[in-house]
Amino acid sequence: MTGSKIILASGSAIRRELLTNAGIKFDVITKPVDEAAIKASLLNEGASVRNIADALAEAKSVRVSAQNEGLVIGADQIMTMDGILYDKPISLAEAKNRLMKMRGKTHYLIGSVVISEAGHAIWRFMSKTKLDMRPFSEEFLDQYIEAEGETILQSVGGYRFEGRGSQLFSKVEGDFFSILGLSLLPVLDFLRDRGAISK
């Protein structure tokens, strides 16, 4: 093992938890990226959701990589439903309204992971998961929001799939880790190939 330094360019608690639980030693370094401006510019150019997620993940990764040695992991996730792109809800009221719209419907999570070194992207992985929400009652939703609190504001969908949020769904097609925001298994494969972690 070469012991290449691994850096996570994300403040996401669940991404940190996934890497930690996998036994990976890493540092967390984040640099602000104007996600709204990048997204607006790409939408104006007619970019696909996949390209937008990829550009955001790359921007986060490259920005940190330009000033720090090692392999820098950047990630982004975008939710789409009925052709509309969604950002993280900013309040519990907004989260409730969104979840009410989502019940009984299908939405997609488009994810990208980009690993950079010396200021350049050297690896990327895209994921797409399809999630069907069950037609839950408003009473259930109120209980869910009360139990979860503001933790649901950390997710673009307004749910923590790894927790009580799993009760919102009737069917899911795709990778569990990708739903949480980091396609962990492909990332681990790349880190092994690079000798950053043991084979």
Give the positions of each predicted feature.
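Short, active-site-adjacent cap segments at secondary-structure transitions
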Residues: 15, 78-81, 86, 116, ...
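Active-site-adjacent loop/tail segments of enzyme domains
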Residues: 77-107, 133-135
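Anionic-ligand binding region
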Residues: 100, 112-116, 120-124, 128-129
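N-terminal polybasic phosphate/anion-binding patch
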Residues: 1-71, 139, 146, 192, ...
